[in-house]
Design a protein with these regions (language model features):
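Short beta-strand-to-loop acidic/aromatic patch adjacent to the donor-nucleotide binding site
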Residues: 96-107
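Short, hydrophobic beta-strand segments that form beta-sheet elements in well-ordered domains
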Residues: 38-49, 125-129
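Short, charged/polar "capping" segments at the starts of alpha-helices
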Residues: 16, 48-55, 135-138
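C-terminal catalytic/acceptor-binding lobe
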Residues: 1-22, 26-27, 174-281
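Active-site-proximal specificity loops/subdomain of glycosyltransferases
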Residues: 44-97
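Short, acidic, metal-binding catalytic loop of nucleotide-sugar glycosyltransferases
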Residues: 20-40
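Conserved catalytic core of nucleotide-sugar-dependent glycosyltransferases
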Residues: 76-79, 87, 91, 106-189, ...
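Short loop/turn segments at strand-loop or loop-helix junctions that form parts
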Residues: 3-13, 47-49, 63-69, 129-132, ...
């Protein structure tokens, strides 16, 4: 039997954060999905002060210690965890064959774990599942049946990852932080570089309530820039080892986004990558 660990980063958010209403819905959807499978363990990685929000049925991994603000100074101090530390915890503390990582505001359809297991059985080594966006008026766990029935709209963002735990030792996560754009970049790049990574774009498997894009706030621009520069550094590293890396559809999409955001404030690695891929799209 394939053993799966699903890791998430609970946050004891306060109003007006969308996470106040999103997290209970996310965790309830996980519990429902667990009823339809076996050998899946949901693991929480969090700061000690966030423990009150963590469901009792989560396996609690060793608390996070560092944040991106320990590495450099930002205009507005936010205690945002390093993605690497989060994945280090689950890969070191579990004996799972496969790891699933999703954000704490990503709801699961009841058949989610069954689908993931079936793809692994069919030979998919690693894959990224694109979420669907459903209307933003849902606020209550009791509305989950209605949320499930929403077809929703397709979204290109990467926020659900499935990969073999044994591959993680080859990954280069850099110092990207959670909670702001481009947190997904180095994991996506690492999965592609490790080989046989697929993007599942149109399946009805995960959902996000609304599309408020609060992460576009101007006071968080330097966090976004930090993550983008880290992603470019890692992608350039992988491209130097294998020129075909840049042609993968997942990398193609990341580079497309990077080109559209490129500014004089981005690193030389960003400039170089965008110059290398001037023919994209």
């Amino acid at each position: 039997m394939i053993r799966i660990a699903h890791v998430v980063n609970p946050v004891d958010a306060k109003p007006p954060s969308d996470l106040v209403t999103a997290q209970p819905i996310t965790y309830a959807s996980m519990q429902i999905a667990l009823h339809n499978t076996t050998d899946v363990e949901v693991c929480g990685v969090f700061y000690p002060e966030d423990e009150p929000i963590v469901p009792s049925w989560f396996r609690k991994l060793y608390p996070l210690k560092r944040s991106v603000s320990y590495l450099k100074k930002f205009k507005v101090h936010r205690k945002l965890p390093l993605f690497k530390e989060m994945l280090d915890r689950v890969c070191e503390e579990t004996d799972a064959d496969y790891i699933i990582q999703t954000n704490c505001d990503i709801g699961l359809m009841p058949h989610f774990y069954q689908f993931v297991r079936r793809q692994i059985e069919k030979g998919y080594r690693s894959f990224i599942i694109n979420k669907r966006i459903i209307p933003g008026h849902y606020k209550d766990v009791k509305d989950l049946p209605e949320m499930y029935s929403e077809i929703g709209g397709q979204h290109n963002g990467y926020d659900c990852f499935v990969f073999p735990r044994e591959d993680y030792r080859y990954y280069e996560m850099g110092d990207v932080c959670m909670g702001v754009p481009w947190s997904e970049g180095t994991l996506s790049a690492s999965m592609v570089a490790a080989g046989e990574c697929t993007s599942i774009k149109n399946a009805h498997l995960t959902f996000h309530i609304g599309d408020s894009r609060t992460w576009l706030a101007q006071n968080l621009v330097d966090y976004r820039l930090h993550n983008t520069n880290e992603v470019a550094r890692v992608m350039k590293l992988f491209a130097g080892k294998d020129p075909k890396f840049l042609k993968h559809e997942i990398i193609n999409w990341l580079l497309f986004k990077m080109k559209h955001e490129l500014s004089p404030y981005h690193s030389q690695n960003c400039q170089d990558l965008c110059a290398l891929t001037s023919g994209l799209r």
